[in-house]
């Protein structure tokens, strides 16, 4: 007698709607990744403890002392947290609502309809509708489906893979991406001023208007029968320069801040902004790319819309800007292209002695090889790894690494968080 083979649905949505009471073992995360996970709705209500800062961008374009005050507030949040809620950001509630309705309408369609837009991860094509494959360091899956595509500049987009239904998806998403691009310029200006640089310096360093890519990723997190055992998105930092995130007011974003997981509140009419690895590198670690993850719940479906602002993969060498380096603060990061930085994160999963993410260094540990490696002056010419990486796709997802928390707060081991064969490309992830 041949035993029947039980197959797990390829989409998390189908699995969630199948009526299961326990999640399949491939979705159960290792215990060390589950520290700090409780009832997300109760966590979100807590007022005690650290809170993600809220930055008011009203009159950020002002020429007077107000912009200097805004600069100080945003700079402080970027240095201390690397993430913030942006309010009075200049993007209308009407447009944001259109973007949300379009994304939710697409995911409300039957899975069979969405499969018409399925990506081909096995062949490196990550644009379109998909789910994470079991390619993280621990071999486990994430409780998430997604839709991913390049959103800006217009000449880099492939509209053929954008959803045709609803009809407002393309116009709403296109206009939103255009306005996020303008907002990114304003933020990069403030961050440049905060480092004592010329206003346009950081924008130039990440590719300028011509080459900075905006990648859209809609994350769909179905209800989960055992949310205490699963993760929607594994712990990671974004490789982007900046990441801008909308959500449907269902909590789920957690930040690893000062040795503990902090749940972000749902702030009405706000956009969450992350500082990514790219800006952290250029600022020599003055601005932080914070470790974060997405948790799930059994009561409500959660959506997030992430736009990752990424530099070109090969044109620019990412390294600390000369103005951020002193004898007391030598370069903390070796020079790499963006593609090499992504590959470094993707392929460090087996190098457990060296791959340590966001490690707190003592003075006598400055030579320790880690993800955020502190280089001595005589090592500044060290060659970045994985030099021969080629770009197979113009666009690739922007979330690229997993960090497994070791329970001690400071040292987190690098894991691979990739969309599968991502052209050593990336958002992910809120």
UniProtKB/Swiss-Prot annotation:
E.C. designation(s): 1.14.20.4
Tissue distribution: Predominantly expressed in corollas and at lower levels in anthers.
Domain Fe2OG dioxygenase: 212-311
Residues given in the record as Fe cation binding sites: 236, 238, 292
Keyword Metal-binding: yes
The protein's required cofactors: Fe cation; L-ascorbate
Keywords attached to this entry: Dioxygenase, Flavonoid biosynthesis, Iron, Metal-binding, Oxidoreductase, Vitamin C
Reaction(s) catalysed (UniProt annotation): a (2R,3S,4S)-leucoanthocyanidin + 2-oxoglutarate + O2 = a 4-H-anthocyanidin with a 3-hydroxy group + succinate + CO2 + 2 H2O
Any GO BP annotation: coumarin biosynthetic process
UniProt enzyme class: oxidoreductase
Signals that turn on the gene: By gibberellic acid (GA).
Basic and acidic residues compositional bias, start-end: 376-407, 415-430
Pathway: Pigment biosynthesis; anthocyanin biosynthesis
One GO molecular-function entry: metal ion binding
Family per record: Belongs to the iron/ascorbate-dependent oxidoreductase family.
Protein name: Leucoanthocyanidin dioxygenase
Gene that specifies this protein: ANT17
